[in-house]
Each structure stands twice: as C-alpha cells, then as structure tokens.
Curated annotation (Swiss-Prot):
Expression by tissue: Expressed by the venom gland (anterior main gland) (at protein level).
Protein name: Cystatin Pr15a
Top-rank taxon, per record: Eukaryota
Subcellular location per the Swiss-Prot or TrEMBL entry: Secreted
Keyword hit for Iron: no
Major location (coarse): secreted
Record-annotated Cystatin domain positions: 29-83
Amino acid sequence: MFTVKLLAFMVVAVSLQHLAEATPKVCAGCPVEVDPNREDIKKSLAHVMAAKNSPDELVRIIKASTQVVNGIKYKVVFEVKNPSTNQVKICKTAYVSRPWEYEGYNVLEFGCKA
C-alpha cells in the first residue's frame, strides 16, 4: 500500500513540476528597457544635456533603459537638432542618479554622431 501511495505522489509531483518552472525569471541588477516617453527619462536627459552645455534641441528619445546599481543607471539613445544649422544627430548617454548622495547626475558617457 505504501508503494502505491508513494508512486501516486511521485506521478503528481512530476506532473506539476512544469508549474514551478513557468514563473518568469527575474534578473536583479540587469538593465531593463523602459518607455522612452517616461517623464523621469525626459527630465533627467534635459538635466544631462544642460550640464554638458549642449546647444542642441531634443527631437525625440529613441531608446532608454534603467539598471539598479548603486543608484539608478540610465542609458538613453536620442535624436537632437542644432537650431543654427538644422543638423540632426543621434546621441548616446549613460548617467547615474544617486539622490541620497548628491543632486544631479553622474554622467558616464555622452556622445553624438551626425
């Protein structure tokens, strides 16, 4: 009798195993693609552009991601236009926000290509 119960338990356990594996994997600390139209992305990018004394005007944000590090790391790809020449460029930046340490952003990377 014990063998039958054990066998029945094992059959049920094996048949339900797929449910335990169906949960999505969470990757703590991995970059996550976010909506480029989020207000925090727009505001933080405006601060970074001002800190870099960029004469260009933001046209649109193409792609953005965030990552939890010792703060929030933002990576943003965006399009700008020079108001004097109307030249359009694609730019990339990466910066970290640590509001408990300082105001503003620690810019790790900032560059544009025509």
